[in-house]
A protein has these predicted regions:
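Single conserved hydrophobic/aromatic residue that forms the stacking wall/gate
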Residues: 1-5, 9, 13
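General beta-strand structural signal in soluble alpha/beta enzymes
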Residues: 11, 32, 54-56, 82-86, ...
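Translation machinery proteins
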Residues: 11-39
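Short coil/turn connectors at secondary-structure junctions
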Residues: 24-26, 48-51, 77-80, 96-99, ...
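Extracellular/luminal Protease-associated
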Residues: 43-86
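Histidine/lysine/aspartate-rich catalytic loop segments that bind and position anionic ligands
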Residues: 89-106
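Acidic, glycine-rich flexible loop/linker segments
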Residues: 104-181
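Conserved, helical-rich catalytic subdomain that frames metal- and/or nucleotide-binding sites
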Residues: 176-193
Length: 194
């Protein structure tokens, strides 16, 4: 689990391609035009090791903007992971690769390369706004965006949340009930067996 401890960490749900992988790093943002991955190619020439490529694809899933070749390049570069608000292809190959990858969908249809899109601009991914440099965290539960400006505040909040959850786990293992742990008031239980 990735406890962020704050609602300031906006959730961007995207399906993980290979379970068990995590990502954490600063966002490098790309906006693509419908089905055109030219801007992603441009971003891959300037992205730094460990950064997370976040692609605003408008949620379109009828043309893939990512596939096996880009994943191979990303692994070679040392990318920290990829989040795409759009479709990928070559799923069988991507599942075998050691690259954290989250996407909205998949399709067999490949991209166009018409030269559209932009790199390093504020974008919206899954209805969550983010900027280059924001912190991206992802695991089996999905992806969260932490604005760069409040990363230290979120880190402290997350540390407190982890300590709190460890205390709860200990109480559960010691045999305490949820009612006692969380100070739940008596709730009437309706019995429909009449």
């Amino acid at each position: 689990p990735t406890p962020t401890g704050s609602s300031a960490a906006s959730d961007v749900y995207k399906r993980q391609i290979r379970e068990g992988m995590t990502l954490c790093g600063q966002a490098r943002t790309v906006s693509v035009t419908h089905g055109d991955n030219s801007a992603i190619h441009a971003a891959l020439t300037i992205i730094n090791k460990g950064e997370i490529l976040v692609v605003e694809g408008g949620g379109f899933t009828d043309r893939a903007v990512w596939g096996e070749l880009m994943s191979l390049s990303s692994i070679h570069i040392g990318l920290g992971g990829v989040v795409i608000d759009g479709a990928i292809r070559d799923l069988g190959d991507l599942k075998k690769m050691d690259l954290p990858l989250f996407a909205s969908g998949r399709t067999a249809a490949g991209p166009t390369k018409g030269g559209g899109g932009s790199v390093d601009i504020p974008i919206s991914c899954g209805n969550v706004s983010l900027k280059p440099g924001d912190i991206i965290i992802g695991d089996d539960d999905g992806v969260a965006v932490i604005p760069f400006e409040i990363q230290n505040q979120i880190l402290l909040s997350s540390e407190k949340k982890i300590i709190y959850e460890k205390e709860i786990i200990k109480k559960i293992k010691d045999g305490n009930t949820h009612k006692d742990i969380f100070d739940i008031k008596d709730i009437p239980i309706v019995n429909d067996d009449n």
